[in-house]
Amino acid sequence: GSEMCIRDSFTSLPSYLPTGSLMIFNNTKVIQARLHFRKETGALIEVFCLEPIEPNDYVLNFQQTEHAAWLCMIGNLKKWKEGTLKREMTVKEQPITLTATRGECHGTSHWVDFRWDNPEITFADILEVFGELPIPPYLNRDTQESDKETYQTVYSKIKGSVAAPTAGLHFTPRVLNALKEKGVDLEELTLHVGAGTFKPVKSAEIEGHEMHTEYISVSRGTIENLIAHNGKAIAVGTTSVRTLESLYHIGVTLLKNPNATEEELHVHQWQPYETAEETASITSVKALQAILDYLNRHDMEALHTSTQIIIAPGYDYKIVNTMVTNFHQPQSTLLLLVSAFVKGNWRNIYDFALNHDFRFLSYGDSSLLIP
């Protein structure tokens, strides 16, 4: 496309999108993932729940009573050498005692075992009452009551993220209705945003960066709708982009191995680049059809797997042809993803944003990218 940059208000978004196009949103919901404990010594320890370990299914874990284990980041770790953290609280008008025991270390995170003494209270109840919403650290402030509303998208449904898919924060019911009136089809999928999203690329070469893995789920209906739209879509947010592009590569795996297990469908970091030659001739519709066939064979309503895809310059986009995204910080994998999409144009776009006082990051302004 042309190198044009235009500044407009977000409410006029529908006027830039063609009737009959398909727009896809990530319906994940941010969980109140930060738990605070005070030791007898007075030290404050923060336990930040990143992903469920036991059980490792999000829904089942939230439904757990009396016991649940998570992979957690621990704040003030040096003060928690050993022993069990304890906190007493009232949940649903019942007094309970929650304990946390630290398990093995995984990189910068630890397994943490939570136990509580009331079989009627679920882990979801505990996070709801006792957890704090993890707003971005650079805001340099405590979480406020208003964040519970402003840091969730209006269409958030499926609990599991530790950060909001922030491109979606701009969408109000009014904008969503205007999109429908314009004849834009709206669909959803789920990617639970992990803390790894914020991990800066520290290596000079991208080969040195290990991408984080995130859980994804896409319903049969969304895949059928993608096929109906010729395998092309407008993605809202980098998380939707990564999920949609991962779908293509999952389809390619299934074309080669129709009996692949859920584990084998996981998209590895460099997989798209290693298979670039063979994928040159595989259309997105063909790849998506392979997923649909897989769901039909197994009588499944949705695809559940995980992705570690890293989208960087040199990546060949297969499904996403337009994206809505905020402005990202330097040294982020998000900026790599954008620059792979608009090719060398990202500098012009970011210069324009800086010169026109656009705001960056989570609570910042938005961009509609049409390469």
Residue spans for each PLM region:
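Surface-exposed, charge/polar-rich loops and edge strands
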Residues: 2-3, 7-371
